[in-house]
């Protein structure tokens, strides 16, 4: 059946939109390469990395939803609790957040310590989450031929978010961190956790949702 409206947008159209944003932000970073600080380049590069991360989770090879929903014990991992609509909102909202943060940094002329801290934690949480999911799925599917802890999103989590996190850690060297910096970091992380993930997922999770995933991507090879 041909998808229309929001169902069409939530299929993969929104991913193409994110990729356009990534290309534009890449151009902006290159144009300001000799002007922007390392910290600002990384904050802006998160806008580029999220679409790449989504491409790995959804398309090449795809199937992140299967490991995510399976981890939370779902009997319907193709649709519950994560569906196409909720994950679209999660990733689009996170991208918009980092566009806003990049704009704030450009206006201020610097990246605040709070923003650095929040982004560092966010980056390393991606590492932890994908490692935990990877181990879980390895244990679950090793009898069916799975031999690694790889899961959709792992490559961009390890070689994208983790690398960015390490670079930003070096940027903290010699700087004094105040309680106000941790508060700012906490606000950013709360927006990501609550606003981008928990609210859309909890509001939209339905076992009879029309926004189900049509295949399990990478995991289909183990489910035959």
Where would I find each of the regions flagged by the language model?
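Membrane-water interface of transmembrane alpha-helices
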Residues: 54-69, 128-138, 200-207
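Short, hydrophobic transmembrane alpha-helix segments
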Residues: 26-40
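Membrane-proximal helix-loop-helix units in multi-pass membrane proteins
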Residues: 97-158
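Small-residue-rich transmembrane alpha-helices that serve as helix-helix interface/gating elements
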Residues: 159-160, 180-200
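Hydrophobic alpha-helical transmembrane segments in multi-pass integral membrane proteins
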Residues: 157-178
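The first (N-terminal) embedded transmembrane alpha-helix
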Residues: 10-30
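Short, highly charged, low-complexity non-transmembrane loops/tails of multi-pass membrane proteins
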Residues: 206-224
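Juxtamembrane helix-capping/reentrant segments at transmembrane boundaries
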Residues: 68-90
């Amino acid at each position: 059946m041909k998808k229309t409206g929001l169902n069409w947008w939530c299929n993969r159209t929104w991913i193409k939109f994110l990729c356009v944003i990534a290309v534009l932000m890449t151009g902006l970073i290159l144009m300001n390469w000799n002007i922007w600080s390392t910290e600002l380049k990384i904050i802006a590069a998160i806008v580029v990395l999220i679409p790449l991360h989504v491409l790995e989770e959804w398309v090449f090879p795809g199937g992140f939803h299967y490991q995510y929903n399976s981890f939370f014990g779902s009997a319907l991992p193709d649709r519950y609790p994560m569906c196409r609509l909720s994950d679209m909102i999660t990733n689009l909202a996170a991208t918009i957040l980092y566009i806003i943060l990049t704009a704030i940094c450009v206006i201020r002329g610097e990246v605040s310590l709070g923003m650095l801290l929040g982004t560092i934690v966010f980056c390393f949480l991606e590492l932890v989450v994908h490692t935990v999911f990877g181990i879980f799925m390895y244990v679950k599917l090793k009898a069916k031929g799975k031999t690694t802890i790889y899961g959709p999103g792992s490559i961009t989590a390890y070689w994208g978010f983790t690398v960015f996190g390490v670079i930003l850690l070096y940027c903290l060297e010699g700087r004094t961190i105040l309680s106000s910096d941790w508060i700012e970091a906490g606000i950013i992380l709360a927006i990501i956790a609550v606003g981008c993930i928990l609210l859309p997922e909890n509001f939209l999770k339905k076992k009879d949702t029309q926004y189900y995933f049509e295949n399990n991507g990478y995991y289909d090879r183990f489910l035959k």
